[in-house]
Curated annotation (Swiss-Prot):
One of its GO terms (cellular component) is cytosol. It comes from Staphylococcus saprophyticus subsp. saprophyticus (strain ATCC 15305 / DSM 20229 / NCIMB 8711 / NCTC 7292 / S-41). Signal peptide: none annotated. Keywords: Cytoplasm, DNA-binding, Transcription, Transcription regulation. SUPFAM superfamilies: YebC-like. This is Probable transcriptional regulatory protein SSP2054.
Length: 238
């Protein structure tokens, strides 16, 4: 799982550098989650999970509150969750998740980003079967052995617990996100470096320096699109 964690860490670092963009994306996601049910995280599981994820990116309270208030009031925007799949250089695979109020615009933008940067879009299912939807937590100051022992005592099953570059990483089933996070808090975890849903590749590939440069340009072009929430891939970024 080490390479997978390296990619998650790299993506997190890039998002942390682009605060205005990540805040805008979370503002939209919080609004959609709040509109999907009660605008209260105590009774709206989707909203609660979105807010927990937002905390790891230090999304300011005023952005969170504005999105929730908008959902409570006159917010009329309706968003569709979309997934696009495609390929980059040398067999690299990419998944693009979007949240949009204009499906045609987003499809055109994503297709253009692929086409102009050495990639091409595939059909639905052409890539996703090579990835696993996973809940991922990154924790400081707790060893993997201590975390695993505590989870076992609480009868909580997870996919894996590893030590990686000074952090303990927990991989779990996505539908157990809240249960696992609550159990981790029972172990004394107050702050999560990462608390996120990821599409993790079953296998990673390495690219030549030239192909990796092309690939990174492609991923950046996709991530820069306003409607794109997440980009996942199977490249080991060295």
């Amino acid at each position: 799982m080490g390479r997978k964690w390296n990619n998650i860490k790299e993506k997190k670092a890039q998002k942390d550098k682009n605060t205005s963009r990540i805040y805008a994306k979370f503002g939209k996601e919080i609004y959609v989650a709040a509109k999907s049910g009660e605008p209260d995280p105590e009774s709206n599981q989707a909203l609660r999970l979105t807010l927990e994820r937002a905390k790891t990116y230090s999304v300011p309270n005023h952005i969170i509150e504005k999105a929730i208030e908008k959902a409570k009031g006159s917010g009329e925007e309706n968003y569709d969750e979309l997934r696009y799949e495609g390929f980059g250089p040398s067999g690299s695979m990419i998944i693009v998740d979007a949240l949009t109020d204009n499906v045609n615009r987003t499809a055109s933008d994503v297709r253009s980003a692929f086409g102009k940067n050495g990639g091409n879009m595939g059909v639905s299912g052409s890539v996703a079967y090579m990835f696993e939807y996973t809940a991922v937590f990154g924790i400081e100051d707790k060893s993997a052995d201590d975390i695993l022992e505590s989870l076992m005592e609480q009868d909580i099953d997870v996919r894996d617990v590893i030590d990686e570059n000074g952090l303990t990483i927990v991989y779990a089933e996505p539908d157990q996100f809240a249960q696992v996070q609550d159990a981790l808090r029972e172990t004394g975890v107050d702050t999560f470096k990462v608390a996120e849903f990821e599409m993790l590749p079953q296998t990673d590939i390495e690219l030549s320096a030239e192909d990796q440069e092309t690939f990174e340009t492609l991923v950046e072009a996709l991530e820069d699109l306003d409607d794109v929430q997440n980009v996942f891939h199977n490249v080991d970024l060295k």
